[in-house]
Amino acid sequence: HPVISEIVFKGNKKIRNNELRENIIIKPGDIFIESNVLLDERSLRDLYIKKGFMNATITNSFVESEDGIKVIYFINEGASTVISEVRFEGNVVVSDKTLKGKISSKEVGFLKDGAFQKTAIEADKQAIINYYMTRGYIDARIVDVLQDSYFNAEKERTEVIITFIIQEGAQYTFNGLTITGNEIFTTEKLESFMKLKKGAVFN
């Protein structure tokens, strides 16, 4: 069985060789298995997407020699996409700062890469709704998420402004409602199960 003699990356500028190597399973000295090379190609692509390089493409080739097989990954990074700003509209009772703390999408800045990931938007929407529910706003919903992008030529990257449009709805509180129809538990027992006191927020 031929072994891998060397692994080479070509075309990468934004992500260093060491970090790329940490994200692949093959290494010099391993028996060459083409399916592992393809798996690693996918891992490298996932790494680029995670860092905001949505259009990165990666291909591979291998060269046989007496020493074994040299695996070459050809990388076309494309422009990165970062979040320049996160905005909220329709939020009255919850501040922008609080909502920003609840979502995984972060604005680019010092110590923050601000990588834009489309898949994070759905999770962010749910995180916002979940927070509103803990505050008793059980009708809260995200009406829309706007994504305005533009190319920053100076920084050679695409920048996105994300706007979450929120409909908060009414707040529900528990005002000592009498529970009827229960024959097994006392009302007091049910209320303790619900962990709700008079005036407490209902969610």
Residues covered by each model-derived region:
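Interaction-mediating elements
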Residues: 1-203
